[in-house]
């Protein structure tokens, strides 16, 4: 992806692109830039022709038609993701809610060694001006859709931290560009009154 602080790779997003697709692209550009010192430009598909590659393809780009995921029948759901490489391109795709962002951070953490341990503490971003690696082809769908950490501290209120660690912040407002906030019931606690209204069931 980079050679002595420079790169030939461009981050490609579809037109139109969703908020999570743009967020995944922007975060990849930021952290890959910090890691390598290179500038990873984000471009949007336009017209019939693609700009020159090689690409890091994010989301449902037209490039996928020529380089499909080599794991047929994969169901990524809303939060799942897939990562694979097909020379010379790298592909990250995922579900429409949080999946594509989860894929971007899976690459940064599991393939490239980045870490975000605790809010307020500097992240661990390896310094790799020359960045060569072989990504593991994979598709993953979280077993649990509700992945909130019930630990009341800065973690509970930090949407960025939860995004980078592929969870949902306990009480933070999660922007639509981050995939929003899943709601399975009216609130996190004190729900019986709403789920089983006394006026209906105990009148």
Predicted features by range, described:
Residues 16, 24-27, 31, 71-203:
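Feature activates predominantly on carbohydrate-active enzymes
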Residues 1-82, 125-138:
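Acidic, contiguous N-terminal accessory segments
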């Amino acid at each position: 992806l980079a050679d002595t602080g420079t790169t030939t790779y461009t981050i490609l997003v579809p037109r139109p692109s969703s908020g999570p697709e743009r967020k995944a692209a922007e975060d990849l550009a930021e952290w890959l830039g910090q890691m390598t010192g290179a500038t990873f430009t984000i471009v949007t598909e336009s017209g019939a022709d693609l700009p020159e590659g090689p690409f890091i393809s994010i989301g449902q780009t037209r490039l996928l038609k020529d380089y499909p995921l080599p794991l047929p029948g994969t169901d990524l759901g809303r939060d799942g993701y897939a990562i694979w490489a097909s020379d010379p391109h790298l592909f990250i795709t995922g579900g429409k809610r949080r999946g594509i962002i989860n894929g971007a951070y899976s690459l940064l953490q599991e393939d490239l060694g980045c870490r975000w341990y605790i809010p307020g503490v500097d992240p661990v971003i390896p310094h790799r001006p020359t960045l060569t690696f072989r990504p593991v082809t994979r598709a993953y769908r979280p077993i649990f859709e509700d992945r909130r950490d019930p630990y009341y501290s800065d973690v509970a209120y930090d949407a960025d931290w939860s995004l980078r660690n592929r969870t949902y912040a306990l009480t933070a407002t999660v922007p639509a560009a981050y995939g929003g906030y899943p709601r399975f019931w009216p609130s996190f606690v004190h729900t019986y009154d709403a789920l089983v209204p006394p006026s209906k069931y105990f009148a």
